[in-house]
Amino acid sequence: MEPEGTSALAAGSRSLFLETVRRSNAACQNGDYALAASLYTEALALDPLSHVLYSNRSAARLKMGLFALALQDAVRATELSPQWPKVMVFFFSCY
């Protein structure tokens, strides 16, 4: 499943975006949360309205103990998609 917003990206940007998201997800699964957060930031530069990416970066930052930054991302994901329940877990975990 492709992240939201990829259809609006130009072909070159779209492939870069998808590869960056793939790498960020792999880094997170491998426990390299710093790399994952950095790659999610790169992907967000290409698609700044992706609630999924903000949520994923929030989770990575939460795992690194960066609670204030994780909360900022959780808040932004909630602003972009208020009905998305997954982000609420990260939101409340920051407290």
Regions found by a protein language model. Give the residues of each.
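Alpha-helical tetratricopeptide repeat
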Residues: 1-95
